[in-house]
Amino acid sequence: MEKFEQFKGIVAPLDRANVDTDAIIPKQFLKSIKRSGFGQNLFDEWRYLDYGEPGKDISLRQLNPDFILNQPRYQGARILVARDNFGCGSSREHAPWALQDYGFAVIIAPSFADIFYNNCFKIGLLPIVSEASIVDRLIRDTLETDGYRLEVNLDAQTVTTPSGEIHRFEVDSFRKHCLLNGLDEIGLTLQHADKIRTFEMNRRDRQPWLFLQQNGDKLRT
């Protein structure tokens, strides 16, 4: 997992509440267990006018010109501002995978579904809970201003607008540490590799019967 760095990015507004995970990445695209390749089907039923299927050539599909992510001014957006209860519905990990694969690094909303919120941190995607009134202003300003950008500083836990207005946000200290240091669950485990190795060696001495083959010979290490 990459370290989360301070950055300034283009904002895309998604002025909808209760966006569920099936809207984020429809069920027909869940067959893959890889984390990559989902970005092209993010919000598939809203981005395209035809029905999407795995393996379908994206270049041949008809874009919905009214959908926010298809508008030129929001190309390259790294921050998504949404409404209440973002990520509700089924607990598919593919939803944050699709958002990240598209290019988003931060999602700002008044509230998130719990499982979606937790899944975001596991892959290095930062979900920021912000007051509804602040989200209102961000969506309004983004719609009114081409190239609207926000600066996100996780270390200081701040979001800064082009006018210099600073909004603070809360984040669990452990999750913050993991994002800043690029540590997912595997990375955290590998920090204790020496202790794990020592434990396994000692366990062979204490419980040798666990390491015997059916014929009584010791398993190779």
Swiss-Prot record:
Chain's role: Catalyzes the isomerization between 2-isopropylmalate and 3-isopropylmalate, via the formation of 2-isopropylmaleate.
Name under which the protein is recorded: 3-isopropylmalate dehydratase small subunit
Any one GO cellular component localisation term in the record: 3-isopropylmalate dehydratase complex
Organism name: Nitrosomonas europaea (strain ATCC 19718 / CIP 103999 / KCTC 2705 / NBRC 14298)
Complexes and interactors: Heterodimer of LeuC and LeuD.
Family: Belongs to the LeuD family. LeuD type 1 subfamily.
Protein encoded by which gene: leuD
GO BP annotations listed: L-leucine biosynthetic process
Matching NCBIfam families: leuD, PRK01641.1
Pathway(s): Amino-acid biosynthesis; L-leucine biosynthesis; L-leucine from 3-methyl-2-oxobutanoate: step 2/4
PANTHER family (UniProt xref): 3-ISOPROPYLMALATE DEHYDRATASE SMALL SUBUNIT, 3-ISOPROPYLMALATE DEHYDRATASE SMALL SUBUNIT 2-RELATED-RELATED
Principal EC category: lyase
A GO molecular function held by the record: 3-isopropylmalate dehydratase activity
Catalytic activity line of the entry: (2R,3S)-3-isopropylmalate = (2S)-2-isopropylmalate
Keyword set, alphabetical order: Amino-acid biosynthesis, Branched-chain amino acid biosynthesis, Leucine biosynthesis, Lyase
Listed EC numbers: 4.2.1.33
